[in-house]
């Protein structure tokens, strides 16, 4: 056996792969979200969400061909719940972006996974890590700037997106025994059925313009198909509490992507925030239970 094969099959690398998959998904999502903004003037929030999820579903169905795998009635119900919250999460977040700033929408939405992490915390160190992540997010995101005069409907949409995000983690964990490609393809298809009526009603035939479809396909691949597939791989092995804390890295990745791709400047406070979020994430990984197997079919997550 070659040295490369030994490294690829090492327990240490196998343990790291779910975390690498999650980080890779967050990087892909950060890049894709920046492209998605270009669709807003063309098809609006509902149309952007419909293109993103609908085209992702087509790509994932073509790649994974989920009908090849057996699907029990219980798993079908779980997939429906997973797809429902996935669709509502995407739609409500884009609806929030119509009237409130991106940073504030992200900050409000992150209350969902961080609350889930708090609920599943059992030790003092767990609560401290969640607190460190929250403090980092508060410094990184413009939570307090321009808070006066915020559109309450936009805030409500962002809060609902946060609730759906927490449920997405819970329901995704319950599908961790399934093939990752099967679960994400069926879930994304269900999400598309939820969103497409809103997108078609708001944008109409503009959704079918060749330039819009091409942009939408790029957004779908980078911001949905790839990251959600990687997240399903990660959810098979990462506990919900650890997953919720690790998601706080996403805005930090977005901020650094903006610095590299858009030449945006980060303040000293924002660099400190990124360091705090990174420390919380490292702590979450180090305190995660070892040797967790994927959940058994029908077992509660």
Briefly describe each language-model feature range.
Residues 1-27, 57-81, 119-128, 146-150, ...:
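Membrane-interface interhelical linkers
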Residues 60, 116-117, 133-135, 139, ...:
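Transmembrane alpha-helical segments that form core, pore/gating elements
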Residues 3-8, 13, 53, 212, ...:
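C-terminal-most transmembrane helix of multi-pass membrane proteins
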Residues 23-31, 35, 63, 80-95, ...:
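Hydrophobic alpha-helical transmembrane segments of multi-pass membrane transport proteins
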Residues 39, 48, 52, 96, ...:
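Hydrophobic/aromatic residues within transmembrane alpha-helices
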């Amino acid at each position: 056996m070659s040295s490369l094969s030994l490294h690829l099959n090492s327990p240490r690398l196998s343990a790291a792969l779910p975390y690498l998959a999650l980080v890779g998904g967050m990087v892909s999502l950060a890049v894709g979200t920046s492209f998605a903004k270009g669709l807003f003037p063309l098809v609006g929030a509902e149309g952007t969400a419909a293109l993103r999820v609908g085209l992702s579903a087509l790509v994932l169905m073509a790649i994974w061909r989920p009908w090849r795998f057996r699907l029990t009635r219980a798993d079908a119900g779980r997939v429906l719940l997973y797809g429902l919250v996935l669709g509502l999460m995407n739609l409500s977040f884009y609806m929030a972006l119509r009237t409130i700033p991106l940073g504030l929408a992200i900050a409000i939405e992150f209350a969902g996974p961080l609350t889930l992490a708090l609920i599943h915390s059992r030790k003092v160190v767990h609560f401290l890590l969640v607190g460190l992540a929250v403090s980092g997010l508060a410094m990184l995101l413009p939570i307090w700037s321009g808070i006066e005069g915020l559109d309450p409907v936009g805030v409500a949409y962002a809060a609902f997106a946060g609730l759906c995000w927490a449920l997405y983690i819970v329901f995704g964990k319950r599908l961790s025994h399934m093939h990752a490609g099967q679960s994400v393809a069926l879930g994304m298809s269900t999400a598309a059925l939820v969103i497409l009526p809103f997108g078609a009603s708001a944008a109409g035939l503009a959704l079918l313009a060749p330039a819009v479809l091409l942009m939408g396909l790029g957004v779908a691949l980078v911001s949905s198909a790839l990251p959600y597939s990687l997240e399903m791989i990660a959810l098979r092995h990462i506990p919900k509490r650890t997953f919720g804390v690790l998601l706080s890295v996403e805005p930090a990745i977005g901020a650094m992507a903006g610095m590299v791709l858009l030449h945006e400047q980060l303040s000293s406070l924002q660099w400190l925030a990124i360091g705090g979020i990174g420390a919380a994430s490292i702590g979450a990984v180090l305190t995660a239970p070892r040797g967790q197997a994927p959940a058994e079919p029908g077992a509660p997550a």
